[in-house]
């Protein structure tokens, strides 16, 4: 799993892949809820919790999702047994030395593309800048 973020260069947005160096999937801290509208319709909602960016992400964006360390995922998911203070302590930037980022092709700007090319490192040709 990786995430995309767009770095601003002047008036241009450059898509980037941000991921763990080991390329392993990772868990994000989030919250979910199920509630009913006044008309009785069931609504399922969720949010991904963000935090201040680490040094890798800071030049790209002013926040980042909370990426959970593998050993912390079960504690986050078991709210009934994890004290609030412990859960809150997990809401911190992921160590930048375990992550990397690189430019990717502008094809990621279109939802119609779903290929490995979307995460491959990309170098913009001078004429494309």
Go through each PLM region and give its residues.
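A structured binding-face within diverse protein domains that lines the active/interaction site
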Residues: 1-129
């Amino acid at each position: 799993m990786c995430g995309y973020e767009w770095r601003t260069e002047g008036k241009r947005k450059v898509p980037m892949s941000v991921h763990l160096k080991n390329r392993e999937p990772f868990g994000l801290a989030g919250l979910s809820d199920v509630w009913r509208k006044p008309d009785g319709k069931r609504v399922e909602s969720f949010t991904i919790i963000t935090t201040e960016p680490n040094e890798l992400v800071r030049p790209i964006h002013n926040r980042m999702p909370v990426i959970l360390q593998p050993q912390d995922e079960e504690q986050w998911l078991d709210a009934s047994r994890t004290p609030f203070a412990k859960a809150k302590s997990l809401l911190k930037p992921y160590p930048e030395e375990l992550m990397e980022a690189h430019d990717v092709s502008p094809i990621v700007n279109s939802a119609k593309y779903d290929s490995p090319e979307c995460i491959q490192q990309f170098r913009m040709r001078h004429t494309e800048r």
